[in-house]
Each structure stands twice: as C-alpha cells, then as structure tokens.
Amino acid sequence: MSLRHDFDRECRRLAPLFAAAQNADRDLHAAWKEGVSLFGGHHHYKQTEQYQKTLDRFNESRQVIDQIIGTALSEAKAGKVNLATLFAYTALPGRYYRSGYQRASIWRFLKHLTLEAEQVQILRGIVLDQITRAGPEFVEICRAARNIDSAELRESVRKLLLQPQKPYVLDRAKRMLDLLEHTSV
C-alpha cells in the first residue's frame, strides 16, 4: 500500500471522530453561553445537569481522537514511523478545544524528520491548504515547511498571493514565502 492510500484511509477514519469532537465542543460552548445568561455571569451554571452532560460528552469524544493521535505520535517518536495518521489529523478541516496544540506538536515533530518523496508531496499539499485555515499552529507549519521546501512549493504559495484572498491569508502566504525564500538561499 502506498502512503497516499493510507493517508486517504486515515482521513476517512478520523473525519467522523474529529467532527464529533467539533460538534461536542460547539454544544459545550452553547451550554456555557446559555448558563452564563441564565445565571447572570456566575459560575453556578457548571452545576447544571445539562452542562455536565455536555462536558462529559465533549471529553469522551475528544478523548477518542486524542488517544489515537497521541498513540500515533508516540509510535512515530519511537521510530515506528507510519505518518499517515499524523498527516491526516493535520489535514482535517476545522478545530475543537486544544486541537491546535496537538497539531502544533505534530508539526514540531515533523520538522525534524527526513522524509521520503511521497511523504514530502503529501505534506506540501497539507501546508498549502493550511495557509488558508490553520490556527495558532501556523508558526510550526512554517517551520516544518522549510524541511519540504522546493521551487514547486514556493510557486504554489506565489499563486495564492495572486488570487483574491482574505487579508490574513495573504499575510500568511507572504510570511511563508519569505521564510522559504530566505531558507533556500
């Protein structure tokens, strides 16, 4: 099996788990807002049954995917490098509470690896996609991008600059391009 096939399979496997964590996170935030308005900003809402159920559901759904990713990262650090799961997690759209921190730790790990050609190709696609939607982990993505720099990647980032984009996307693309051009010199 190719890494591309494994990556696609992992994306399909993780997507519903990630979506469940996102939905539970959204519900928890809604319960929090409702509780704050009901109790006038006091923290008594945390004792309500609805809030506790929502919190439990969020923790359970997040724990499932966090455990999969934690295990994959631990195994990768131990030398059993199957990066499909880690690549898939970084590629999934959206976020939930603390998912950005987990993604940042994955990117920190990836920047130290010597990658094969197929791994580099997949990671370049993820990096380009994350320019438009990453959260606080974008700094780590930029650092990892130096490891997979190529003329092709820089050209793809330049193309992003020529397309109509939101201002933050343009800023990120400029930042990424500056970093890659200074690294390649």
Name each model-derived stretch:
Residues 1-140:
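Extended repeat-based scaffolds of very large eukaryotic assembly and lipid-transport proteins
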Residues 102, 107-185:
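Extended alpha-helical scaffolding segments
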